[in-house]
């Protein structure tokens, strides 16, 4: 998570989204289902040009002390709450209780992932939930007029200074972008065995 925060200072970087994911049981209103849980940063919606249908997305909390808020994918909202407005309701993810603050617009399937059958929680809480030491990947968007090689070099410089060695991979997501269509100028990076970095 500290790596992601450091990348915010790289020139031309627009949004930074630290990411971890796994599967967990989600319970509410006496109903339960197993869904994909995405641990993300507060800029995830901007990074992937996704819109909130109801309520709001995760707030910019201190990453080390993020509140137990959750944003529901549209299918999870429908399955657990039907036509009832879920905002303010409590749901259980794993052994923790979260307060629903938003519902995402329907996105359907992207690259084989059903983005509607998911929930979004703060990345630090996802790391605890899945007992992980580090991020899976960090998504970075950069300004469209910035040269890609300069952005990559800036990210590499910051990570080398923090890690002392090149234990990460940086992957410009051009093929993914062609498929997704709606995401522009994003980079993803993967950090060592614990995770990765993507440039979107």
What are the roles of these predicted feature ranges?
Residues 2-57, 170-171:
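Short amphipathic beta-strand/extended segments in non-transmembrane regions
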């Amino acid at each position: 998570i500290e790596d992601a925060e450091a990348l915010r200072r790289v020139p031309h970087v627009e949004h930074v989204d630290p990411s971890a994911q796994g599967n967990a049981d989600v319970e509410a209103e006496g109903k339960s289902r197993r869904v994909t849980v995405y641990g993300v940063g507060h800029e995830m919606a901007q990074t992937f040009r996704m819109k909130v249908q109801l309520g709001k997305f995760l707030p910019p909390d201190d990453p080390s002390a993020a509140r137990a808020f959750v944003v529901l994918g549209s299918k999870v909202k429908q399955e657990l709450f039907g036509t009832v407005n879920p905002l303010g309701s409590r749901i259980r993810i794993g052994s923790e209780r979260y307060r629903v603050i938003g519902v995402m617009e329907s996105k359907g399937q992207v690259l084989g992932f059903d983005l509607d059958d998911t929930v979004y929680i703060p990345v630090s809480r996802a790391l605890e939930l899945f007992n992980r030491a580090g991020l899976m990947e960090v998504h970075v968007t950069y300004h469209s007029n910035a040269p890609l090689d300069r952005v990559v070099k800036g990210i590499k410089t910051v990570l080398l200074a923090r890690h002392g060695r090149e234990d990460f991979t940086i992957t410009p997501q051009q093929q993914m972008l062609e498929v997704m269509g709606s995401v522009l100028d994003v980079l993803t990076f993967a950090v060592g065995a614990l995770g990765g970095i993507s440039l979107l």
